[in-house]
């Protein structure tokens, strides 16, 4: 059995998977990391077997007016990611189909979830979702980023289900490409993020920051942030001066998205 870690997205999506890959290899497990071509050197430096998915990060957004709009709007940014996924879906689907074998263990973030569900069903694989932000459906505000209501609320539950549905849907082009290739079953409930083959969920956030919600799915584990250690890195003098100038700052963020 190989642990196939699927990291579709930015550096914030890749680094936790790379940290997990290194930990698994330290335990003697077979690991294969799938990611964008841009990250092959980082995987090589970490000693992790890597296979690119035949596509690269989005280039600079043009025209400049659209780039400014994307920086200021999560909606526009999401639409640009959706367009990129649509254009890259065929290459990613082919890479997944080649890399995954019966009995493997798939670990994927949200953008690869629909496609990995299809492969898990078709090839008898175990599937674990790696959530890098507290966005699982829940009624409890303390366990949900961007919760519209404090405490427990049905509005929170409805909001989080809608966010979940929209996030999983962004990866549907990859699942559809798999379906057309014959590597997955027809896209139905599994592609919409309902029911299916997820055997467990890892919430890679600190339990001190994100308490476990009572209504999270069974098998959900809050592990803390998966940190890729870089002992050779040294902070630049300007950063050291900043850190020494007062009380230690507190950064709160999930994945590659700063929150506060």
Stretch-by-stretch model annotation:
Residues 1-51:
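N-terminal subdomain of nucleotide-sugar transferases
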Residues 36-41, 45-249, 254-259:
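Nucleotide-sugar-dependent glycosyltransferase catalytic domains
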Residues 13, 259-260:
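Short, solvent-exposed loop/turn segments at secondary-structure junctions
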């Amino acid at each position: 059995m190989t642990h196939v870690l699927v990291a579709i997205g930015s550096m914030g999506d890749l680094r936790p998977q790379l940290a997990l890959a290194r930990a698994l290899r330290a335990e003697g497990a077979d690991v294969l990391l799938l990611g964008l071509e841009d990250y092959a050197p980082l995987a090589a430096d970490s000693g992790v077997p890597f296979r690119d998915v035949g596509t690269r990060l989005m280039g600079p957004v043009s025209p400049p007016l659209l780039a400014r709009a994307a920086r200021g709007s999560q909606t526009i940014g999401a639409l640009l990611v959706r367009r990129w996924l649509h254009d890259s879906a065929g290459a990613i689907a082919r890479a997944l189909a080649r890399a995954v074998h019966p009995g493997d263990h798939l670990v994927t973030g949200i953008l690869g979830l629909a496609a990995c569900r299809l492969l898990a069903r078709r090839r008898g694989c175990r599937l674990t979702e790696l959530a890098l932000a507290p966005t699982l459906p829940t009624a409890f505000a303390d366990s949900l980023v961007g919760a519209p209501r404090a405490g427990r609320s049905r509005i929170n539950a409805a909001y989080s289900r809608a966010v979940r549905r929209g996030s999983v849907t962004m990866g549907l082009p990859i699942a559809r490409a798999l379906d057309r290739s014959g590597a997955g079953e027809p896209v139905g409930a599994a592609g919409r993020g309902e029911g299916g083959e997820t055997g467990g969920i890892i919430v890679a956030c600190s339990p001190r920051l994100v308490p476990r919600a009572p209504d999270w799915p069974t098998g959900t584990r809050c592990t803390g942030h998966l940190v890729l250690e870089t002992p050779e890195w040294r902070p630049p003098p300007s950063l050291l001066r900043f850190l020494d100038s007062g009380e230690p700052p507190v950064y709160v963020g999930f994945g590659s998205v700063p929150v506060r």
